[in-house]
Amino acid sequence: MSFEFIRKLPTPDEIKEQFPLSSQLQELKKNRDEEIKKVFTGENNKFLVIVGPCSADNEDAVCEYVSRLAKVNEKVKDKLILIPRIYTNKPRTTGEGYKGIVHQPDPEKGTDFLQGLIAMRKMQLHAMDVSGLTAADEMLYPENWGYVSDILSYVAIGARSVEDQQHRLVVSGFDVPAGMKNPTSGDLSVMLNSVYAAQQSHPFIYRGWEVKTEGNPLAHTILRGAVNKHGNSLPNYHYEDLNLLLEKYHERDLVNPACIVDANHNNSGKKFEQQIRIVKEIMHSRKLSNDIHGLVKGVMIESYLEEGCQKIGEHIYGKSITDSCLGWNDTEALLYYLADCE
């Protein structure tokens, strides 16, 4: 057997007991979850903006970012619901590179999963406390969900995970919205199959237990662009793409049809500055069609304190060490633009 069992890690309950959620933050999450849920059920017309760094690598910078976001939120909260993007696990195309704070709490040092789980929990709690906002993260590892299940208000399933059965089954047990991204091929049927699976009840094995879920009616789609056989980006945020998704939804027995559009990744061709133009086009499409207006519940934007990206070890505070992001000034202006659109 080629596995080396290095050490047993604390269970989610043990980590939660060590770093508990205060009663005040529990109430905050309850209220935020209810408000966000109503967007997906059609009871709330506010527009969702999931915004933040490509990867949350530094607690101080992330907490400064969400503190700034909280100040903007006070001015736009009648029109928008801002959800900080605090991504603590990063899928890597080749398996190499920085995989997030859970793997490496210090990007310049080796893997330390024990300290990584603690760092993830502490950062999410700190960000929630200083901003009054509950966050979004990507569920890269389904078995790790329990470490943050009482903190997150939104979860994304990535393009490389969306076809995986365990991801779909675990999402079916969530009580928060879960966005299922289209795969890198762009196949909408794969994404919609994933949504369908997540909305159903399932029995399965999870963390050594036989479990059964009730299904998640808040599972929905995320359009993030695709890649063709030549490796070129194919965007899927245009009016005709949104119309096609709407038609595909109508062909299926799915509840709460909804879409979030990811303005970066293959929609922008990884040209981060294009996110501003893309978001504006999405808002224009919503104005042109009541059906698209009802389908597109929000956007996802990669943004940090400083624009662009840097190599690990350059130590530029608030600048991404993974994909390039919008800087704060452009982000703030874009958020006010979105509020004016609503």
Per-region residue spans from a language model:
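N- or domain-start disorder-to-order transition segments that initiate the globular core
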Residues: 1-41
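Conserved phosphate/anionic-ligand binding catalytic regions in large, soluble enzymes, centered on
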Residues: 48-61, 323
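Acidic (Asp/Glu)-rich catalytic clusters
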Residues: 40-43, 70-77, 125-130, 213, ...
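Active-site-facing alpha/beta catalytic cores
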Residues: 66, 79-244, 265-270, 275-281, ...
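Short acidic, Gly/Ser-rich segments with clustered Asp/Glu that frequently serve as metal-coordination loops
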Residues: 54-57, 256, 264-270
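Conserved, mostly hydrophobic/aromatic
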Residues: 52, 261, 327
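Internal helix-turn-beta structural module
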Residues: 304-342
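N-terminal beta-rich core of secreted/periplasmic extracellular enzymes
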Residues: 25-39, 72-83, 89, 120
